[in-house]
């Protein structure tokens, strides 16, 4: 990953990534870091709330505090939104404008897509089509689930048939 930063003037790095130290050490870029778990980062997510249909948190850093409400559930969305917001700021987008864009962001159909049911359970569609992808989505759902997770998945189409037994195990 650190090869991405060898020629960059600016670098936005997830401080919680196991490769963060190597990426920071291997760059001459101006580095901005972000984290959910570590206070040593330039920006941190505080008071993270994983809800069935969204994620909320406070972004704190460089004398700025902003409340983020993102209609894409899961902890991975916190990381993705922090990285996107900081990259936008590096490109000159004002902090409050970048926050507003995150609030308006919608997920992609078929990727952790919440289906309204007006019931006491939540239905989520995700187009995970590999063993790793299925494992990641189920891990993300475990973070926000308040009960059982029932998983129905298919392996149709022209996808690699050798993945199917691994996905079912």
Residue ranges of model-derived segments:
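Switch II (G3) loop of P-loop NTPases
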Residues: 122-129
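Conserved cofactor-binding/catalytic machinery of classical short-chain dehydrogenase/reductase
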Residues: 83, 129, 133
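Acidic, Mg2+-coordinating active-site environments of NTP-dependent enzymes
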Residues: 1-122, 146
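Anionic group-transfer/hydrolysis microenvironments
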Residues: 16, 128, 156
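Active-site beta-alpha connecting loops in nucleotide-dependent enzymes
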Residues: 108-110, 132-169
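Active-site flanking residues adjacent to catalytic metal/cofactor-binding acidic residues
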Residues: 13, 125, 153
């Amino acid at each position: 990953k650190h090869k991405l930063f060898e020629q960059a003037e600016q670098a936005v790095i997830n401080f919680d990534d196991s490769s963060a130290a190597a990426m920071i050490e291997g760059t001459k870029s101006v580095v901005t870091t972000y984290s959910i778990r570590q206070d040593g980062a330039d920006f941190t997510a505080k008071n993270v709330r994983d809800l069935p249909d969204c994620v909320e948190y406070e972004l704190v850093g460089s004398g700025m505090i902003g409340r983020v409400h993102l209609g894409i559930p899961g902890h991975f969305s916190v990381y993705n939104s922090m990285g996107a917001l900081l990259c936008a700021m590096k490109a000159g987008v004002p902090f409050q404008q970048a926050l507003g864009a995150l609030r308006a962001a919608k997920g992609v159909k078929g990727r952790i897509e919440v289906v309204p049911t007006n019931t006491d359970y939540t239905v989520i569609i995700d187009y995970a089509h590999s063993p790793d992808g299925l494992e990641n989505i189920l891990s993300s759902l475990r973070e926000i689930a308040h009960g059982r997770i029932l998983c129905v998945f298919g392996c149709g189409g022209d996808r690699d048939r050798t993945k199917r037994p691994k996905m079912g195990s």
